[in-house]
Amino acid sequence: MRGASRTDAGVHARDQRVAFDPTVVIPPRGWALGLARHLPEDIAVRRAAIVPAGFVPRFASVRKRYRYRITFDELRDPFLEGRTWRVPARLDAAVLATLAEEARPLVGTHDFAAFRSAADERESTTRTLFVVAPEVDPADPRSLWITVEGDAFLHNMVRILVGTLLDVARGRKPPGAAARALASRDRRDAGITAPPDGLVLDRTWLSNEGEDAWPPDLPP
């Protein structure tokens, strides 16, 4: 099996893409319904399509959207455990404004060497971010989502971006820390690595979305 993203343990995915080469011919509807009977409750096949043999979703990925949830609450909420980063502080307009201001220099094509884990040894660390946007969750005023869209990502890149933004908002890093980390390429200038719980791979765009998709009316 070949996936579109290598998500860390504890990270969630709403739109992970997986390809495999079957030994039997079954239409996409049959795969979607049949696999559902054999998967655990926290994994679901929401769409199936036919792609060429040997298709690798990771190499066909042209854009991804991640969303990270932060909940500002001194008390633990059992309904959100494992699905948010709980911060014992108050979410107000000043926090949101600081996050938005700190995120602004991250949009565009930059060298994100300071925003990757030590385990990531890829030569090229240049990536393009189209969106870095914090917004309050309309269904939960305690929480906000930070949406990050880009052409590709380094290991732990989104989690370090989020950690840096929140470090500045909480006064643990000086204003402009994200921009300085971009310029220096030094991991020490960036913030902490946010925990995996709040991160969701929300959308994956591929150069080839496949054929005969089922269900046909579900967005890819």
Language model feature labels by segment:
Residues M1-P220:
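Structured-RNA-binding interfaces characteristic of tRNA pseudouridine synthases
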